[in-house]
Amino acid sequence: WVRQGLDLLDALGLEKVHLVGNSFGGALAMALAIRAPERVQRLVLMGSVGVPFPITEGLDAVWGYEASFENMRRIMDYFAWSRDLVNDELAKLRYEASIRPGFQESFSAMFPAPRQRWVDAMTSAEADIRALPHETLIIHGREDKVIPLSNSLTLADWIPNAQLHVFGHCGHWTQIEHSARFNRL
């Protein structure tokens, strides 16, 4: 995936970019910055994977999603702290997207059980993370049930030029649950 990201930058003729990575995408953004630091200006990591942690019940449920409206409704409860955001209408939209031809097959092939191995595979070495020279904004929801807040605390400790912002009353959807404040960051 990192190679694909670098190939995309090349295809678009982009020499140096700001990278924003959410969750699994945070691990990929960080891995790309480690592999090709000269291609990255700044990093934004949101509820990021990339450091060691035991898989959460929420992440295991999300990665193990089997298409049904009920399952979609259930996993959405892991994403948001605010019950106002989790409703049947949104669950229906996300469920319908999940049953498009080919989606379920490709999604389930990405993270088959046992899933802890995929968390471990996305982990970057501590020394590599500590060597990142980039200004890095780390954002996390305090009540995140998918990726533990401790991940962002570790990243903030290890990345020399990191700033950490934790949103209270917020789950894994920082950009949705606190959109106006998130955008001001």
Residue ranges of predicted features:
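Active-site loop/oxyanion-hole signature of alpha/beta-hydrolase fold enzymes
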Residues: 1-21, 183-184
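Gly/Ala-rich beta-loop-alpha elbow adjacent to hydrolase catalytic centers
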Residues: 21, 25, 29
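Flexible "cap/lid" loop of the alpha/beta hydrolase fold
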Residues: 30-35, 40-74
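Conserved alpha/beta-hydrolase catalytic His-Asp/Glu region
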Residues: 66-130
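Short alpha-helix in the alpha/beta-hydrolase fold that links the catalytic acid
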Residues: 90, 125-126, 134, 148-157
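Acidic catalytic loop of the alpha/beta-hydrolase fold
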Residues: 117-119, 142-147
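Short beta-strand/loop motif that positions the catalytic acidic residue
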Residues: 132, 138-140, 144
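Catalytic active-site module of serine/aspartate enzymes centered on a nucleophile-bearing elbow/loop
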Residues: 160-185
